[in-house]
Amino acid sequence: MVNIIQPKVDPLPTGIGLTGKTVVITGASAGMGLEATKQLLRLRASTVILAVRNVAKGEACATSLRQDRRIQTHNPKPTIKVMELDVDDYHSVQRFSKQLREEIPVVHILILNAGIGLLKLERSASGHDRTTQVNYYSNVLLIAELLPYLQAGAEKTGSPARISWVGSRAHEVTSLEKKAPIKPGEGVLAHMDKEEAFVPFQRYGDSKLLCVMFMYNLAPRLDPKKVIINMMCPGMVNTNMSDVLPMHLRLIVNVVKSFRARPVEVGGWIILNSALVVGPESHGKFLNDKTISDKSAFIKSPAGQEIQKKLWEETINEIGTLTTLPAELK
């Protein structure tokens, strides 16, 4: 049941200071990614890496951020670096990871924000459904590429690195349960690539289900003294994600957003709460807004547990063909 009015969300607590910290945020040139970047800089982050698909747009954002009066007041000389990252492309993920490892000594916080929600099945260069490629596969590869690097940074600093992944409570109502269930003996990844398994208004949530299942599998394999991983849902936020919809649907969604959607600033608070405020208690947890939530009924069901197990095995097999897996992913 969707609440008509979303709960009130409080601002971030006072006293957060990011002096000396380096943060990477994907999808940083628009929407919540850009807003979270602004907030990070106002919190005096020393270095912020804008990981973006369109470098020219990213550089324009960086220029605007440097000229922002509120940022200048709190953080007059931050390092704002733009790096190309197209999460629709495995090769771009690998190039970005290599550049990051070579150019940035330590990353303290990695925010996985980039995402899309398409209403028809499109293919990425990998052959996978594009929504799932962007929201799931490429983020898993990015984690695999950067995990040893993040762990090494934690050893240097004496504090755990953070991975905060933007998820969605839409994963709780999945087409995999009734509308497009996985058949006995069918692979999870193969199923997600089938035309007949693509349920337009549920594919975004289905892709986010894979994300949260992967996190639930990964977290117990990580030492939270070295890396804390969590996932959050900011709820409905007034961003341009609905721009991909056909005009008639966009008009309807925009009407709903006009009375229900949160300001983008609030979405930024929710992202940064997971990345900066909550501690080890959030490791391997999904947060609705700022509240740690239980696993969904489907994930806890026997069918959900079987999918989660198969998903891990199949994903690791695929990612293992692209990169040398860290021990935690073997």
UniProtKB/Swiss-Prot annotation:
GO biological process terms, semicolon-separated: terpenoid biosynthetic process
Molecular functions (GO terms): oxidoreductase activity
Matches recorded under Pfam families: adh_short
Residues forming the catalytic site: 204, 208
Pathways involved: Secondary metabolite biosynthesis; terpenoid biosynthesis
Positions that bind NADP(+): 57, 86, 113, 204, 208
Family of this protein: Belongs to the short-chain dehydrogenases/reductases (SDR) family.
Miscellaneous comment text of the record: The macrophorins cluster contains a single gene insertion (encoding for the terpene cyclase macJ) compared with the yanuthone cluster that produces the linear compound yanuthone.
Protein's UniProt name: Short chain dehydrogenase macD
Organism classification: Eukaryota, Fungi, Dikarya, Ascomycota, Pezizomycotina
Gene expressing this chain: macD
